[in-house]
């Protein structure tokens, strides 16, 4: 397995698909990286030479934020919004959907497991 940006990418898949295993690289960005490195997108990772792998590593590390750096930046952005108490920050603090989704009947994933509410007390006759 080749190792790029501290991620083991699978050998038996096409290069474009393998690059998407790296956090922060989607199909479009993977294709763009292949074009910059002048490597065929259909080439499998196990067919790459050492020089091509080094070229890919250099392009990814110098021009793109991926893996740890990107995760850290996203976390800091969320923390900043929480600190300034903007609307999105408050939604993060309350563990509710941030981008305007409905919460009346949905958002179970974001809100967590449903909490049972005690039923009405039976009247004594």
From Swiss-Prot:
InterPro entries according to UniProt: Rbsml_uS13_C, Ribosomal_uS13, Ribosomal_uS13-like_H2TH, Ribosomal_uS13_bac-type, Ribosomal_uS13_CS
A GO cellular-component term linked to this record: cytosol
The entry's keywords: Ribonucleoprotein, Ribosomal protein, RNA-binding, rRNA-binding, tRNA-binding
Record carries keyword RNA-binding: yes
GO biological process, one term: translation
Gene3D superfamilies: 1.10.8.50, 30s ribosomal protein s13, domain 2
Domain of life according to the entry: Bacteria
PROSITE patterns: RIBOSOMAL_S13_1, RIBOSOMAL_S13_2
Molecular-function GO terms, alphabetical: rRNA binding; structural constituent of ribosome; tRNA binding
Pfam entry (one): Ribosomal_S13
Assembly with partners or alone: Part of the 30S ribosomal subunit. Forms a loose heterodimer with protein S19. Forms two bridges to the 50S subunit in the 70S ribosome.
Entry similarity comment: Belongs to the universal ribosomal protein uS13 family.
Protein function: Located at the top of the head of the 30S subunit, it contacts several helices of the 16S rRNA. In the 70S ribosome it contacts the 23S rRNA (bridge B1a) and protein L5 of the 50S subunit (bridge B1b), connecting the 2 subunits; these bridges are implicated in subunit movement. Contacts the tRNAs in the A and P-sites.
Stored PANTHER family: 30S RIBOSOMAL PROTEIN S13/40S RIBOSOMAL PROTEIN S18, SMALL RIBOSOMAL SUBUNIT PROTEIN US13M
Name this protein carries in UniProt: Small ribosomal subunit protein uS13
């Amino acid at each position: 397995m080749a190792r790029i940006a501290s991620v083991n990418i699978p050998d038996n898949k096409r290069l474009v698909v393998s690059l998407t295993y790296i956090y922060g690289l989607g199909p479009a960005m993977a294709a763009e990286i292949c074009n910059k490195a002048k490597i065929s997108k259909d080439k499998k990772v196990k067919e790459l030479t050492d020089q091509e792998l080094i070229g890919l590593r250099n392009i990814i590390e110098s021009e793109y934020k991926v893996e740890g750096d990107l995760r850290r930046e996203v976390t800091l952005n969320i923390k900043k919004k929480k600190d300034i108490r903007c609307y999105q920050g408050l939604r993060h603090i309350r563990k509710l959907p941030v981008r305007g989704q409905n919460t009346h009947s949905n958002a179970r994933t974001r809100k967590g497991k449903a909490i049972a509410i005690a039923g009405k007390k039976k009247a004594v006759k």
